[in-house]
Amino acid sequence: MATKLDTSSLLLALLSKCSLLTQTNLALSLLVASLASLALSLFFWSHPGGPAWGKYFLHRRRQTTVIPGPRGLPFVGSMSLMSNTLAHRCIAATAEKFRAERLMAFSLGETRVIVTCNPDVAKEILNSPVFADRPVKESAYSLMFNRAIGFAPYGVYWRTLRKIASNHLFSPKQIKRSETQRSVIANQIVKCLTKQSNTKGLCFARDLIKTASLNNMMCSVFGKEYELEEEHEEVSELRELVEEGYDLLGTLNWTDHLPWLSEFDPQRIRSRCSNLVPKVNRFVNRIISDHREQTRDSPSDFVDVLLSLDGPDKLSDPDIIAVLWEMIFRGTDTVAVLIEWILARMVLHPDIQSTVHNELDQIVGRSRAVEESDVVSLVYLTAVVKEVLRLHPPGPLLSWARLAITDTIIDGRRVPAGTTAMVNMWAIAHDPHVWENPLEFKPERFVAKEGEVEFSVLGSDLRLAPFGSGRRVCPGKNLGLTTVTFWTATLLHEFEWLTPSDEKTVDLSEKLRLSCEMANPLAAKLRPRRSFSV
């Protein structure tokens, strides 16, 4: 009996010791694993460019030239660079600090990124077939943009969309056809500004021009015409959808770069996308249904064009919704943002505004309104638009980045497949090695002297290519530039734009969302220039 008891006690004691040993080993194993993981993370982080680049170089098979750049922080890299509302300025300053203006590497969590602030390297990236794809963010995928021109993978489907848009929305013939529409909306803007000025004394043009730009795209894409002076439920609804979409696409989503965060959705981007998409589907489906119920001999707007496609070009309804949604989305913001920057510069530089007025009086006179056909003769005004594009590019980082499809060589350095590439157009446009006195507002630099070729901002010269270049150049660049120049000519022909006080200052603070807009809306006094107000 006693022996049995002693044996049982011994067994219990041994089991207890084994249990203790197992727990100790487990704790030690976890500690060793944690320390090893931390050491590895610190090793990755210590590499130029930060953790994502350190991980790549650990597994590389051949020695390659290191691309300089900031390490950032362990695990997250340089997320703070892109989280800033002045990301383009932060990146430019960092590139200068590391003497990496030609090519700089940094990490966004687990994402490898390269960025250039040099026009030659920018041309190499943007015109390379290796960078024909775009990295698709979670928000872009959720909002269906992976099935539209902006984010669709480079290939047959993307080329089909590009061809359809180029032929039926952005061709010179189509731009000419929509001239009357832009003229009508320009007249409506003038009426609204006159009314606002008479009522309040001050004018805040931002919201008005955004709504006008939205109306313009709704007319081209959906065939819907609205009076700018009246409130329309459909316009207000679409404006809310577009604003929410801008906010979602313009926010740096940490889960895109730190996959272990994806389950938590810390910024609620996935949740907000899930709420937005059904609303977009209902809105666009309603438009499509209306068009299907109508019978027309020939397409009258872009919805009709998409519905009439047949054969290999035929699109499914979800793809049609994605394409239409993107056209409205992309075609609204840039025009309004750029016009507000131009008007701000005119208020800040009354001498330059006076030169524009003199040109308008010479070419157009004060007895009639500006017509779109006048714009080709408005050389100085065109130079003003280009100079504002240089100082205040709406997409300072060219809005959407590129993605390396395969390993490649850029500026003599190996760039692996899967690397995100960015071009800091703002930095190039402010580089004293590229532009003389780059901080000075001087439209004359874009006025071609006799025998010189006019400077093009449409992508052929990477010293200033605000619409991008290469395969992924903005397809609506000609339409956007035409609209901006004509509406600006109208606003400056009809009014003199003045500071609201005697301080003669304008707040040029920036805020980078999806586009780089004025941080505070422009406030101005208007003085009519024509007795024949539209």
Curated annotation (Swiss-Prot):
Gene3D superfamilies: Cytochrome P450. Expressed in the funiculus of developing ovules. GO terms for biological process: fruit development; seed development. Its main location: membrane. Plays a role in seed and fruit development. Functions probably in association with CYP78A6 in the regulation of seed growth. Belongs to the cytochrome P450 family. This is Cytochrome P450 78A9. It comes from Arabidopsis thaliana. The lineage of its organism: Eukaryota, Viridiplantae, Streptophyta, Embryophyta, Tracheophyta.
